[in-house]
Amino acid sequence: MFDSKAFLKNVPHDPGVYRMFDKTDTVIYVGKAKDLKKRLSSYFRPNLSSKKTEALVASITRIETTITTSETEALLLEHNYIKTFQPRYNVLLRDDKSYPYILLTKERHPRIAAYRGAKKIQGEYFGPYPHAGAVRETLSLLQKLFPIRQCENSVYKNRSRPCLQYQIGRCCAPCVAGYVTDEEYQAQVEYARLFLQGKDQQVLDHLIAKMETASRALDFENAARFRDQIQAVRAVIEKQFVSNDRLDDMDIISIAYRHGVACVQVLFIRQGKVLGNRSYFPKVPANTDLSELTATFVGQFYLQAHQGRTVPNSIVVDHKLEAKEEIEQLLSEQAGRKVSIQDNAKGSKSKYLSLAQMNAKAALTLKLKESTLISERYRALRELLDMDKINRMECFDISHTMGEQTIASCVVFNDAGPFKSEYRRFNIEGITGGDDYAAMEQALKKRYDRDLTPEKIPDIIFIDGGKGQLNRALKAFGELNVKWDKNRPHLIGIAKGVDRRAGQETLILSKTGREVNLDPDNLALHLIQHIRDESHNHAISGHRKKRQKAFTQSGLETIEGVGPKRRQALLKYLGGMQGVKNATLEEIASVPGISRALAEIIFETLKH
């Protein structure tokens, strides 16, 4: 449940942009304001202006803000965020995780794709983009402008005729001979490369020259095609979010520190475009000098190659670095070009550094308030349960679709809130489909039927369910054969109300047998709802991944005797998985490397 009063206390009277999130941590609305505090306060008045606003407010679980130096800048940044996130409540503006990159591979017919992680694949990397949504949007845009393939090599190498992407004009079918020459394809690749580098005008100049050449040669069909491409590129350029100052690729880094907590704010600028900002809260030893913290952060942020980050040409910081020259040298060596670190920003860079500083302070204020609120919620829960301390809590939930692809989730909270590195999921197998009780028992045994160090033993275990689920959990604990004290955790069931609305939960306390209904404004209930919702979302996301994996598997992977080479041969000679499924026994047996006996097994397996 979102605590609007606590949130609004720390929102400044500054221009900026705000992003609203729902319970799945998805951005559902982006807005701008001349005065953030006044604008955000208007959402939480008793009488709202429309049903849409009421629905929006009811879905909010958290809000993030970005302070800007002017209302105009807020408008531009709002535009960028809306393009990135495409929130469902910004319907009127729709036309307008390491970090993800866009990869252009180095091959005869390069493909363009989203990419995360260490840069092990040969090719060019463009980014970083602040969110995967920005990458998806850019790829979709590129596919419309420049028909370059985005398919995996396993698909590209096994095509005998063009796919649907060719039919709708999103790919020029380099996979099949006779549809596009290597020179024509490379020209489209070069346009995409220039576009990603921000050299929009060069793309237009090339296309205009091509159109004029085709016109002079009376090749009006190609001239019309180039004309349409020029119009599409111009339409995109007109809508792009570009800084008025053509700044170099740079990251702006600012640090705010208060009460033992540090916030590092990074503002990303690429090709003159402000891609977005992110806040980091590193663990900081007491009395750490901020110059030292800046140097440590810069080193960890850019020099860890496995994170696959691109080092910008310029890094602007707000504290002097003692080892600045050494860090510059290391970063330059890694980037293969000169990288400078500036601690005396002037002009436009100074303006953006001030912007990063404001956002660092605002994010730190919210973080400190959040930490205080978590402490207050923990104290309320300790009082409710009459416990001296609560160091660790865990919560379980089950997710499945009609009993299939069942997943159990376990989330962990410590005194700082969610402890995400300790989150776990469990595949549930060997039970009757839809038997949530058996699924819960199996998950608990997988989690606890082993040795645990003292700090890993939870003080409280929440079970998302009523008496039945709790009793099955107690049964599972009773059957544990472990050395650690299995009676230490307090098992608590969270039973939903009659109409399953938040605030109507009943807590079932295993140690006393009491059933407790708390007031919707109770801080202990807010903490319980938080951990329950985390567990629910963690279970659902795991289940969706498992379901998608099962859906996308071809079916050949499970057939004994069909390895990668035979699988590839089947897909190639029979025209993909649909062709394999529709093939006769004789057609399968005619594939090189497939015996009659194996063909019969494949045929029967896929048919039944």
UniProtKB/Swiss-Prot annotation:
Q: Which residues form the GIY-YIG domain?
A: 13-91
- Alphabetical list of PROSITE patterns matching this protein: GIY_YIG (PS50164), UVR (PS50151), UVRC (PS50165)
Q: Which UniProt keywords apply?
A: Cytoplasm, DNA damage, DNA excision, DNA repair, Excision nuclease, SOS response
Naming one, the record's GO cellular component terms include: excinuclease repair complex
Instruction: Give the subcellular location.
Output: Cytoplasm
Tell me yes or no: is Magnesium among this UniProt entry's keywords: no
Segments forming domain UVR = 201-236
Keyword NAD included in the entry's annotation:
no
Any GO BP annotation = SOS response
Q: Which InterPro entries match?
A: GIY-YIG_endonuc (IPR000305), GIY-YIG_endonuc_sf (IPR035901), GIY-YIG_UvrC_Cho (IPR047296), Hlx-hairpin-Hlx_DNA-bd_motif (IPR003583), RuvA_2-like (IPR010994), UVR_dom (IPR001943), UVR_dom_sf (IPR036876), UvrABC_protein_C (IPR050066)
GO MF term list: DNA binding; excinuclease ABC activity
The record's family statement is: Belongs to the UvrC family.
In terms of HAMAP family, this protein maps to: UvrC
Please give the subunit comment from the record.
Interacts with UvrB in an incision complex.
Q: What does this protein do?
A: The UvrABC repair system catalyzes the recognition and processing of DNA lesions. UvrC both incises the 5' and 3' sides of the lesion. The N-terminal half is responsible for the 3' incision and the C-terminal half is responsible for the 5' incision.
Q: What is this protein called?
A: UvrABC system protein C
Q: Which organism is it from?
A: Actinobacillus succinogenes (strain ATCC 55618 / DSM 22257 / CCUG 43843 / 130Z)
